[in-house]
């Protein structure tokens, strides 16, 4: 989030600098410096602005260019993180602090194995947070050789968007697919199900969708079968 986004959010809420500063617990002079880019926006401030100004979690900070995002093999509560971001399948788990959807998506795609219900929620992130930082996400997916998993995720999201005649979202998702296509990997992978047996892999090769085959993934997931595609 930068000063321009902060100003736009204030105006969208029909607030003066004085009103916004009071709501966020800072002075009007300090608020003015934030909008002009003279002062950095701390994560704590952005999280408070997220609540007060009703902002999208896509404004939350992402790991720096230098730091990148690790493969994060440790156990993660992705169901809770999806629920915090509004995913209907885990709506009852909205108790965690929100994280940037792009970071949640990348970290989830880096997992060797995910609960099937969590995996089904990943295209929902791409669909519902289409304004996320795709440049950051695509770049980091390539760093970790996860562009095929990301490409398949976006393909499913695009299927859902087109099925709902949501041309604006579909256009943005197709642009992401175009950015990923040149770096598509030839090696075979799973959609976060590396523990799949040889028998299961053989079955998947015969029954996967054209999109899964295009992205060289062994999975039977299809956009039309996702619960949120039917609503």
Explain the meaning of each model-derived region.
Residues 68-131:
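Helix-turn-helix/homeodomain-like alpha-helical modules used for DNA recognition
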Residues 6, 17, 28, 43-46:
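Helix-turn-helix DNA-binding elements, focusing on the entry/boundary residues of the two helices
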Residues 42-59:
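DNA major-groove recognition helix of helix-turn-helix/homeodomain DNA-binding modules
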Residues 24-40, 62-67:
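Recognition helix of helix-turn-helix/homeodomain-like DNA-binding domains
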Residues 167-231:
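Charge-dense, extended regions
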Residues 4-23:
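Short basic helix-loop element that most often maps to the first helix and adjoining turn
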